[in-house]
């Protein structure tokens, strides 16, 4: 089997893994925002055995792709394959009017979750943005949601008001109301998300006539996991596993 380098480039972080035969080895993620990507690649990839193929899910930032393409060409004489969402793949049918406009990270995560579950799933990616995607038992993508992540919610509040920026940490949801500014902000964000997820699960039970299994991934997944009204499965490598699935069928 070919040695695959799988790469997930989000708005803030880069994650990667090597898949060789049946072995899947994921590296620790790195923050790329504010850094020279080529320097990070030197540190992480400069010492590894060259892959046979590179499969990438990436946000649409041309400068990042250009740096990555140049690095792969210089060091390995390889041209990466960038995942583009399609109408149908690996048993999942895309709900978007224009299939290619669905984020490739969302598509990869959906493919991996449905492949693992072989049934209805709700995929929640908790990164810079929070995305939600739902797939039926038959593999039909019902659509999704996009909203600001927890840090984005905090940042917009500080930018649009006279509140002084402070580091906001999650507060135990033992009460609805806070008694200081920090707790008021933290509880406001958490209860907003919690209410959304409760409403979402109620809707999906009616729409699907079953309760889908929720898969969580992304940097804030563990912080958000407790806000879900039903059992969840946390998988930090969901996008990378989706890329591996696509690569195995390429």
Question: Over which residues does each language-model region extend?
Answer:
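Glycine-rich phosphate-binding/hydrolytic loop that grips phosphoryl groups
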Residues: 162, 232-250
